[in-house]
Amino acid sequence: WNTDSDLVEQYINALALKEDLPEGDWRIDTYKTHDNLGLWLDKSCLQYFGSTAAPNILSFYPALGVKRDVRSQPELSNYALRGLLSVRYLLTTLAHQKQFHAEADEGWAYYDTLDGYVLYENQNYVPMGFTYDYYLTEAQYEDTVTPTRSNLLMRALVLTEEDAVAYGQYLTPLPTAELNDLTYTRYTQDCADRRASACTAFEMTSAGFHAEATLDRANLMFFSVPYDDGFTAYVNGQETEILRVDEGLMAVLCPAGTVTIDFVYQPDGIRLSRTVTLAALPVFLLYIGHFA
């Protein structure tokens, strides 16, 4: 704790910054700061050190060439990942501002200097929850080159073969020509296209998250949240199947019009443990009564 001269200062500054950041639920990124600033800011952060991780992150990240062990540390050069994961702001320090400018793409605009941090706003930010026009299958996705897969994921949703059969009717198969045009310029256009269909409201809750959207047609709504069997999704109050997409994230089918979406999380096994507990309770009471 005391071995790094500025560690305590950065964490104290982060607590102050938490009160000064704009309202809303979105992700942040950091550059050359100490680990886990997101915990102090109460924000999901791309740069994270911890021994626990959602299992599906261990398939999603490696498919993009991002190492995930006890640390998540996507390189700044993987710019498209920031749009895909709804990163709105990046934090760095005054000491590393010049180095950040040298490495960053042109999509970051200076926002402010607050509480010891220099903030940059992502000009290609896409709010949490958005739809696509195209899809491709996991087999097609795995045939593409790894370095530009993040760009591809801003253009098309990756479905399993089974889900492509069941849900492909709501999307168009990605044309072959679109597999190759993966430039930064096209990325900015893809972000604009995704932003046009993004949720109008997104809020983290104590049990998961809530979102609202208005769609001109039935479509799959994508959320860059790791897939987990503990989630239950409700669209307009009706329980809805959750699809595992992009080799580890989630999507749900939404009808045309105004929709409300709620994801509620219970750790896998909780329901079973409650049943077992209730079944065992009479036996326990008999046991206690016998020896009373």
Q: For each of these PLM feature ranges, what is it?
A:
Residues 1-194, 206-210, 222:
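Conserved luminal/periplasmic juxtamembrane motif of membrane-embedded glycan-processing enzymes
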Residues 172-292:
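Active-site-proximal, structured, solvent-exposed surfaces of multi-pass membrane proteins
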